Amino acid sequence: MTISSKISSDFDKQSALKVITGLNNFNIPQIKQMALASEIAKVTYLDIVADTDIIKEVESVSKIPICVSAVKSKELLKCQKTGVNILEIGNYDCFYEQGRLFHSEEIKLISKETRNLLPHATLCVTLPHILKIEEQVKLASDLQRIGIDMIQTEGKSTSISKTDHLSGMIQKSASTFSSTYTVSSKIRLPIISASGISSLTSPIAFLYGASGIGIGSNIRRLQDIGSMVIYIYEVQAAISSNHNIQQNINHSIQSSKISHQLIPY
């Protein structure tokens, strides 16, 4: 795996944050805004559609590390030649809206083909939420054997969750967190939680074993760079606060005279 030290460090510290512009988003002005906001807020990397023209547009305004997402290995191959940092098979939401579903065998086939074409690229694969938890664990294990570098979990798609905004976000985040918790306990790859992640829910992802999170829909609703930066800062503050709480709890337990009485679970 070839990955920048900044990205690797953020994953190691369980503080990686990526901004997702969307697999079906070709709105260049909006993508540029999100790229600039991400760079100002110092997010780990930006996740965009696998399109060489959009890569050029982003690179014209920002030096932020780039991940490109697609479901076809040839599209990823084209983008890899531009020097992007991460290639991702995933972001299926726009396909779910069309009734297009992805199952384990197809994901493995695409992953094998991509790895064979690009043996040294950093590859991430999203586990489809339509799979049962045990199927997601099996797929993640198979992907680890194929040589995939990172796994992303997702929640129920917006086309399936026909609820109000807050309820839908909670439902989606609960779904991706349950996948993150189970998968992270079975494999040794970094896990990214995405879908329904907000400043409210982001700390939970790391408690459940995530090495990073992806946010997108809440940022795309904002109209200017300043608002986007403020929202990203809110998420980062929530993550930082959670890490401080974890450190304090761990320190208190380790220094406590009754720590041996605690029951591990």
Curated annotation (Swiss-Prot):
Its main location: plastid. It comes from the Eukaryota. Coiled coil: none annotated. Keywords: Chloroplast, Plastid. InterPro entries: Uncharacterised_Ycf23 (IPR007570). This is Uncharacterized protein ycf23. It is found in: Plastid, Chloroplast. PANTHER family: PTHR36895, YCF23 PROTEIN (PTHR36895:SF1). Belongs to the ycf23 family. GO terms for cellular component: chloroplast.
